[in-house]
């Protein structure tokens, strides 16, 4: 359920914002257009939003500024503390993509950025199936995350990272569960969603799935 990576991200908590805003050369392409990616997720979201992987609260802040009601889920205690320091009074609960407390009101959108790859493909499909039962017709899943058009593209990106000496990025790509667009499309359509995929940079795709 992605919690096996908690130690890594708790160590990254203090420097995460520095990385996403381009100060870590290895991850510069991963976070290229970061503000645009977050803003696009906000634009495509409804009024009551369940957010997975709040992290330091960058997306959450934008959702709140857009007058959305946000219920955040974040498994890392240090990340939750950083987000609360940044945002003030906001609901951020301990949980993950598969095990989480439900909000006390219906929500129309589930969002996440840079986090769904913490799940294996089997767990991703389990999560999407669960969200299908929770969303009403017309409800949305709006995710932005690293994925690849096929396995060859994935392998090529690992080779490129190694060639550039980007050891951390290469290890990241091999350690976590980065999947392909065809695999994600199958998961969403199997569970009653229509889905579109839009490339946002060399790594990240925007996924907008609508419950039918």
From Swiss-Prot:
One of its GO terms (molecular function) is S-adenosylmethionine-dependent methyltransferase activity. It holds the Pfam family Methyltransf_25. Transmembrane segments: none annotated. One of its GO terms (biological process) is methylation. Its EC number is 2.1.1.-. Keywords: Methyltransferase, S-adenosyl-L-methionine, Transferase. It is an enzyme of class 2 (transferase). It comes from the Bacteria. Gene3D superfamilies: Vaccinia Virus protein VP39. Disulfide bonds: none annotated. PANTHER family: TRANS-ACONITATE 2-METHYLTRANSFERASE-RELATED (PTHR43861). Could be a S-adenosyl-L-methionine-dependent methyltransferase. This is Uncharacterized methyltransferase Aflv_0758. It comes from Anoxybacillus flavithermus (strain DSM 21510 / WK1).
